[in-house]
């Protein structure tokens, strides 16, 4: 697996005259799979994405501004270019979910979605059904692949949600389910993305609606590059070393 070091934000609008199939191709003609990661604030979405990309865990992050990352991965003999779109936390109001248009465009843009909740936050679990329904409404006429991820499995002493409830709900919604500890286990994180990529078929991608393809035209806010991620990882590691030394 090789991480592509040119981090950006959501895919550029396809060139004039390009076809739906062209929009599904990444660098070197490889099939491109676009994944949006959504969920409530504080559930570990950014940590999940960075863990998948770098195999590293960084405990502290700045509030997410919506970054997109790209890597290559080999799945069943095929090399895929994967774009993973991190998103800000979703809020809930009396009238339901609060999803701004930028988030809606991210979801429409995606070929698949990861819905993340934390076993330490029951409200994040309660969001799953509404969020899944919202995702499917933004993809009418198709069954978008979705994986539900229960994060922070290592924090059993503050658990508010039994992971079995997440499994049952995911099964009811027709989604795959993974219980993970982003801080302690990379393999489970990788498996969740691996399975999701397998569920995205070339036929499904090529049948994207014109509306879905137009959502590729999204402003490109500045996002961190690999050097920035490495810098933050070193800072987090240095902070841990200082803490141990001072004890």
Swiss-Prot record:
Its EC number is 3.6.5.2. Residues 204-229 are annotated as: Disordered. GTP binds at residues 39-46, 86-93, 151-154. The keyword Nucleotide-binding applies. SMART domains: RAB (SM00175), RAS (SM00173), RHO (SM00174). The keyword Protein transport does not apply. It comes from the Eukaryota. It is an enzyme of class 3 (hydrolase). PROSITE patterns: RAS (PS51421). Keywords: GTP-binding, Hydrolase, Nucleotide-binding. One of its GO terms (biological process) is negative regulation of transforming growth factor beta receptor signaling pathway. GO terms for molecular function: G protein activity; GTP binding; transforming growth factor beta receptor binding. InterPro entries: P-loop_NTPase, Ras-related_GTPase, Small_GTP-bd, Small_GTPase. Belongs to the small GTPase superfamily. Ras family. This is Ras-like protein family member 11B. It comes from Rattus norvegicus.
């Amino acid at each position: 697996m090789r991480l592509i070091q040119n981090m950006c934000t959501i895919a550029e609008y396809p060139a004039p005259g390009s076809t739906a199939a062209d929009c599904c191709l990444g660098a070197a003609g490889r099939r491109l799979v676009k994944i949006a990661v959504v969920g409530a604030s504080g559930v570990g979405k950014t940590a999940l994405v960075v863990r998948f990309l770098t195999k590293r865990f960084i405990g502290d992050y700045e509030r997410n501004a919506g970054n997109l990352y790209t890597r290559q991965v080999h799945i069943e003999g095929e090399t895929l270019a994967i774009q993973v779109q991190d998103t800000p936390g979703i809020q809930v109001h009396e009238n339901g979910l609060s999803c701004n248009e930028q988030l809606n465009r991210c979801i429409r843009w995606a070929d698949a979605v990861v819905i993340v909740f934390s076993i330490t936050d029951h409200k994040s679990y309660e969001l799953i059904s509404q969020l899944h329904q919202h995702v499917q409404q933004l993809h009418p006429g198709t069954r978008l692949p979705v994986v539900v991820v229960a994060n922070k499995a290592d924090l059993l002493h503050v658990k508010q949600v039994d992971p079995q409830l997440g499994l049952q709900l995911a099964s009811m919604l027709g989604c795959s389910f993974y219980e993970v500890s982003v801080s302690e286990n990379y393999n489970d994180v990788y498996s969740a993305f691996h399975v999701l990529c397998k569920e995205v078929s070339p036929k499904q991608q090529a049948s994207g609606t014109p509306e879905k393809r137009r959502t590729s035209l999204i402003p490109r806010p500045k996002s961190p590059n690999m050097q920035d991620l490495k810098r933050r990882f070193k800072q987090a590691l240095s902070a841990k070393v200082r803490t141990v030394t001072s004890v």
